[in-house]
């Protein structure tokens, strides 16, 4: 049996120290967190990747506008033949896994920069295709394959760069891009590049083609690629 006096002593709550500071209720953080999308746009690497993505996409969609018209006028091809020639431009895309291995090994900067450089000579040489002959058809197909290869190289490196940018930002400021790390938003920025290219590219390329032909369009696109190599070399994968 426990006496009432002893039980009262055990049940009595412990005394608090009057001198100990009372914890204050936590105050909400008055500083507003910057949205992850704005944090991404502050990165020079992302801007360089976005520009390279936009230029490469512009090159590709420019052929969507002009190539069918060109082969119809120069080679008197049907719509079916005009569609088939796009295989030359798109077949190098199937090398994507191999190009991805190269990007993982040597870095996105080199694979992207080399890809953009690869597109320049065949774009300039498009002016050599100017009449109907088998040799001219073979030449056009060869030039398109090289352009497609360069575009596949550039895009493979640039797509890898988007995720690496997120990793780099998170390594410096953990949690700044949110729980998911900002990957989806960075890929969304890539989609913006393609949307702008799809909007601007056909308008500009169609205007140039109508005024001066495919050769001049190739020159304009090659200059655009040459300018793009500079930010790619200086900012991608840095």
Can you name each region flagged by the protein language model?
Residues 95-108, 126, 209:
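Helix-to-loop junctions at the C-terminal end of transmembrane segments
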């Amino acid at each position: 049996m426990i006496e009432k006096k002893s039980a009262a002593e055990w049940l009595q709550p412990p005394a608090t120290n009057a001198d100990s500071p009372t914890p204050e209720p936590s105050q909400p953080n008055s500083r507003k967190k910057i949205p992850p999308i704005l944090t991404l746009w502050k990165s020079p690497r992302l801007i360089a990747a976005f520009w390279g993505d936009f230029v490469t996409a512009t090159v590709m969609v420019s052929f969507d506008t002009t190539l069918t018209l060109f082969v119809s006028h120069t080679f008197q091809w049907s719509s079916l033949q005009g569609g088939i020639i796009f295989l030359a431009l798109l077949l190098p895309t199937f090398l994507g896994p191999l190009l991805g291995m190269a990007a993982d090994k040597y870095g996105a900067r080199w694979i992207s920069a080399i890809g953009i450089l690869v597109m320049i000579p065949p774009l300039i040489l498009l002016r050599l295709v100017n009449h109907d002959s088998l040799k001219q058809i073979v030449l056009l197909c060869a030039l398109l394959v090289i352009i497609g290869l360069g575009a596949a190289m550039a895009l493979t490196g640039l797509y890898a760069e988007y995720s690496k940018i997120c990793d780099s930002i998170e390594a410096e400021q953990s949690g700044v891009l949110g729980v998911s790390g900002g990957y989806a938003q960075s890929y969304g920025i890539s989609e913006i590049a393609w949307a702008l290219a799809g909007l601007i590219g056909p308008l500009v390329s169609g205007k140039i083609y109508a005024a001066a032909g495919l050769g001049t369009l190739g020159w304009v696109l090659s200059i655009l690629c040459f300018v793009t190599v500079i930010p790619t070399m200086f900012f991608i994968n840095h």
